[in-house]
Each structure stands twice: as structure tokens, then as C-alpha cells.
Swiss-Prot record:
One of its GO terms (molecular function) is urocanate hydratase activity. Keywords: Cytoplasm, Histidine metabolism, Lyase, NAD. The gene is hutU. It is found in: Cytoplasm. One of its GO terms (cellular component) is cytoplasm. PROSITE patterns: UROCANASE. Disulfide bonds: none annotated. Belongs to the urocanase family. This is Urocanate hydratase. Binds 1 NAD(+) per subunit. It comes from Pseudomonas paraeruginosa (strain DSM 24068 / PA7) (Pseudomonas aeruginosa (strain PA7)).
């Protein structure tokens, strides 16, 4: 038996147009989105199946990828494919409204939910890290997090700077699949940004895709550019090659005062995602094979230094927040007792949106035609005519965001509006206004689909941060409601042992059957977010539940 391979020198792109390569659009859609996750315009390291986030993969190995593709092409519309940590393990007879694919990635019994145990399983070919949208086949490149990052920066501007970020600058690090959204989000919010990244290839990627505007040659040059652009009120993003664990302490030593500090390095995965200070990337990858425990220790030591610098900025009164990569936890484990003195971005800025079921609604055009996305942009404006903030986002997205792979759009909307938009998109497919079906999905980072005490569910007012029944219920309800594919993952965003989360995708193929499924899924999915926050006692969520007619027996009293 040949050894399964995680490397293949190949380029993959999803088919375009309206010609099927599978038996229906319900199986063509997951096939194209799986391939799109591995498009070289989309994935961080597609030849090793890595989509984003350290080692977040789309399939366990290339043999599994081949068999998934083969199976999806043969799958009937009354069958369901089961995928276990990136490996296709079964096809079962179900029914037309059941999901065509059910995915479980990286899930471990809690006592064994550690990176050490996971890495052992991964090395033996028994597991795969799915991150959030890597293993659930709905990653759309950095755009997928741009609006969430933009909303965070805008809200921080409202809270700290009277809603005006002109002449202000953000200090951050990480230009990978997620962190790469930061420079563009800051620019769209009106601020300059200094973005530290330890790999030149990632800086080059963001420069090519226009997510970052310029690269400075060194720290002095970067600070000179920041000073010039902030004085002129220009929102320009600057990349700097270097190590955040070295540069942030130097900025503190120099007395430099950013206007906002955060971080989006892959600190959740010390073995694969965070370069120790003083090391080259080549040393880091080589030693990860020969001395993984030593690498983890060195990376976490550097994270501790990084967080201490962030704490120093906070002590100066500078708004400082964690952007969900678990760096505070890593620093705390290295002895930084007050690592959690600065907040995470969700309790600080995003939770009121979650209380209304508002989160990262996204869709992709299976046709590959950008015009299909532009037509849906116009439909969103037509159906939501009075939301100037949303209209501004769509205008900026069209102007500044380069599509990666299949054209796609991210748009934060909540309960009520998601179903309205989904049904409208389905009608556009039916009428021929769109040239092929649309898939609608979301990040697992949503209001009802994740339990993550150091990120999305940090500081819940009832203390239910670590209760993970909610994403399980979300996945079960989306399955019962007829989503086209449903996923249930562990460890995304913050690493092993720190999160559980679920995802869903539904196809708009223009049929009546699709319309019925869309109405159920795109109501019930955000409805679980309102339910979860109402159950925790948030008045905004309770009011939303009543306004939207949710039947929450312990809260709304509806029978």
C-alpha cells in the first residue's frame, strides 16, 4: 500500500460556467467549492492542501481528495456523503432534502483535545485540521474576513475616536489568509496601518491582490511613512517584513504610540503558525520535524514577549484587543499572568451584532462570472434600501476587493434579511438573470454556530462561555432544515481544545425545492444565534427574538 501524500505539484481550479460535471447542482456545488478552496489564488499552500490558518486543509491527503471528487461526481440526489477529517468514509441513502455532504473535522474527545494528541494523529494519517472554512469548503480568500475586521475597526473608532479614524493608525501583525484582511479593512475604515509579517511571500500575495498598499524597507522607513500619511489624513496600509515579537517591543522602547493595537498571526498553532524571535522560517519548519516540543516552547516564549508589548501599549491608554488567535492564552501558559487584561474583539465590539443574528453571510457565483456578483450586489441594495452603512460596504468592496478564485461577496446581515436575500438570489437563477447557481454560506465565526471562550463566546454575561451544545444544535438544525452541506469542527481559530463550531452551505439553483430549503435554512441558522444570546440574557437578543417571532419556550412564551 502506498503512503498517502500531502504534496502534489498541481494547480486546481473549479470549473466555470453552467455545464455540470456532477449529476446535479447539489453535488456540483460542493465539488466546485472544494476545488475553489485549493485554487492558487485562494489557498495559502494548495500543493499541500493547506487553505489557510496554519495547517487548515481541504482534504486529509491527495488520495482522499481524489476520492471525494470522484464520489461527488457520482453522488445521487437521494444520497449523502460522509467526510471524516478530510476523508470520504461513506455514502448513505437519505432523501432529496437531506444534505448531500456531512462533514466532521478535527473533533476529539475533550480530555484528548490537545495539539500534542492531534499532531500524533495527524502524523499517522488519522486526522486533519479543518480550521473553519478550509475543511468545510466555503473559504473565499481574505474577503471572507474583511468585513468583520472592517466592522471591528469602525466600531473601535466609534468607541474611542468619535467615529473618525482619519489621521489614526493601527498596529498589527500577520498577513496570512485571515490576517491578510487587516490592511484593507483598516484602509476602508479610514485608518493607516502597519502590518508586520515574517514571510515575504505573504506580503507579495497581499500586494498583488491589493489588500496592502506598500512595503517599507525597514522599521524606520515604515514609521516615516506612517507619520507622513497620518499627517496628510491618508488611509494607506504598509507591510513590514519582520517578527512581531521583536518589532513590538522595539516600538514600546522607542515610545511610539499607535492609535489601535491588535494581532492576527497564527498564534493558535505554535508548531506551524508562529515564528519564534531570532529564527528564520526555514529553521522553524526544519525544527518542527526534528524537535516539535522545542519549537512549540520557543514559539510560545516569543508570544509571551509579543503580548507583554501589547499590554504595555494598553497601559498607555491605547485601545488594544485580541483578534481571535488565542495569543493571550499562549502567553498566559508562558507565565504572563495578566495576558487577558486586554479584551477580545467580540465582547469589545461585535457582540451586539451577534445578538441580532448579524454575521458573515457570504455567497459565491458558481458560474465564475463577476457580473453575477455585481447583480447580486445590486439586489442587496434594492432589498435593503435604507442601510447606508451596508451600501457603503458594498461600494467599497466592489472598488477595492479583488476576487480570489470564484467571484464571491461577504455581507454582514442577520435574521430575516438572510432568508430574504437567499430567496431573491434563487429567483434570479430561476429567471436567468444569473448565469448559473449561487452558493450561500458563512464563516463558522457566527452568532449561533461557535463556542469559543477565548473568542466568540468570551465573557458571556451568564458565564456560559464554554458550553458547546450550541454549535451542535446549530449543525443538527441545519441538517434537519435541508442545507446542502453541513460541517462540525473543533479547534478552528484558536486551536485544539479551545473551540467547537459548525458551518452550512446551501445552493440556490432556481428550483421550488431550493426555495423551500433556503427559507428554512436561512431563517433557522441565524435564528440559533439570536436564541443562544437570548438564552444568555442579552436584552437585544430577547427583543430580536420577539420581533422576529422566534418560539423560545423559556423566553418568548410562545406555544
Amino acid at each position: 500500500m502506498t503512503t498517502p501524500s500531502k504534496f502534489r505539484d498541481i494547480e486546481i481550479r473549479a470549473p466555470r460556467g453552467n455545464t455540470l460535471t456532477a449529476k446535479s447542482w447539489l453535488t456540483e456545488a460542493p465539488l466546485r467549492m472544494l476545488m475553489n478552496n485549493l485554487d492558487p489564488e485562494v489557498a495559502e499552500n494548495p500543493k499541500e492542501l493547506v487553505v489557510y490558518g496554519g495547517i487548515g486543509r481541504a482534504a486529509r491527503n491527495w488520495e482522499c481528495y481524489d476520492r471525494i471528487v470522484e464520489t461527488l461526481r457520482q453522488l445521487n440526489d437521494d444520497e449523502t456523503l460522509l467526510v471524516q477529517s478530510g476523508k470520504p468514509v461513506g455514502v448513505f441513502k437519505t432523501h432529496a432534502d437531506a444534505p448531500r455532504v456531512l462533514i466532521a473535522n478535527s473533533n476529539l474527545v475533550p480530555h484528548w483535545a490537545t495539539w500534542e494528541h492531534f499532531n500524533e494523529l495527524d502524523a499517522r494519517g488519522l486526522a486533519m485540521y479543518g480550521q473553519m472554512t478550509a475543511g468545510s469548503w466555503i473559504y473565499i480568500g481574505s474577503q471572507g474576513i474583511v468585513q468583520g475586521t472592517y466592522e471591528t475597526f469602525v466600531e473601535a473608532g466609534r468607541q474611542h475616536y468619535d467615529g473618525n479614524l482619519a489621521g489614526r493608525w493601527v498596529l498589527t501583525a500577520g498577513l496570512g489568509g485571515m490576517g491578510g484582511a487587516q490592511p484593507l479593512a483598516a484602509t476602508l475604515a479610514g485608518a493607516c496601518s502597519l502590518n508586520i509579517e515574517c514571510q515575504q511571500s505573504r506580503i507579495d500575495f497581499r500586494l498583488r491582490s491589493r489588500y496592502v498598499d506598500e512595503q517599507a524597507k525597514d522599521l524606520d522607513d515604515a514609521l516615516a511613512r506612517i507619520a507622513r500619511y497620518t499627517a496628510e489624513g491618508k488611509a494607506i496600509s504598509i507591510a513590514l517584513l519582520g517578527n512581531a515579537a521583536e518589532i513590538l517591543p522595539e516600538l514600546v522602547r522607542r515610545g511610539v504610540r499607535p492609535d489601535m493595537v491588535t494581532d492576527q498571526t497564527s498564534a493558535h498553532d505554535p508548531l506551524n503558525g508562529y515564528l519564534p524571535a531570532g529564527w528564520t522560517w526555514e529553521q522553524y519548519r526544519d525544527r518542527a520535524q526534528t524537535d516539535p516540543a522545542g519549537v512549540v516552547k520557543a514559539a510560545k516564549r516569543s508570544m509571551a514577549v509579543h503580548v507583554q508589548a501589547m499590554l504595555a501599549f494598553q497601559k498607555l491608554g491605547i485601545p488594544t484587543f485580541d483578534y481571535g488567535n488565542n495569543i493571550r492564552q499562549m502567553a498566559k501558559e508562558e507565565g504572563v499572568a495578566n495576558a487577558f487584561d486586554f479584551p477580545g474583539f467580540v465582547p469589545a465590539y461585535i457582540r451586539p451584532l451577534f445578538c441580532r443574528g448579524i454575521g458573515p453571510f457570504r455567497w459565491a457565483a458558481l458560474s465564475g462570472d463577476p457580473q453575477d456578483i455585481y447583480k447580486t450586489d445590486a439586489k442587496v441594495k434594492e432589498l435593503i434600501p435604507d442601510d447606508a452603512h451596508l451600501h457603503r460596504w458594498l461600494d467599497m468592496a466592489r472598488e477595492r476587493i479583488s476576487f480570489q478564485g470564484l467571484p464571491a461577496r461577504i455581507c454582514w446581515v442577520g435574521l430575516g434579511l438572510r432568508a430574504k436575500l437567499g430567496l431573491a438570489f434563487n429567483e434570479m437563477v430561476r429567471s436567468g438573470e444569473l448565469s448559473a447557481p449561487i452558493v450561500i454560506g458563512r464563516d463558522h465565526l457566527d452568532s449561533g454556530s461557535v463556542s469559543s471562550p477565548n473568542r466568540e463566546t468570551e465573557a458571556m454575561q451568564d458565564g456560559s462561555d464554554a458550553v458547546s451544545d450550541w454549535p451542535l444544535l446549530n449543525a443538527l438544525l441545519n441538517t434537519a432544515s435541508g442545507a446542502t452541506w453541513v460541517s462540525l469542527h473543533h479547534g478552528g481559530g484558536v486551536g485544539m481544545g479551545f473551540s467547537q463550531h459548525s458551518g452550512m452551505v446551501i445552493v440556490c439553483d432556481g428550483t421550488d425545492a431550493a426555495a423551500a430549503r433556503i427559507a428554512r435554512v436561512l431563517t433557522n441558522d441565524p435564528g440559533t444565534g439570536v436564541m443562544r444570546h437570548a438564552d444568555a440574557g442579552y436584552p437585544i437578543a430577547i427583543d430580536c427574538a420577539r420581533e422576529q417571532g422566534l418560539n423560545l419556550p423559556m423566553i418568548t412564551g410562545k406555544r
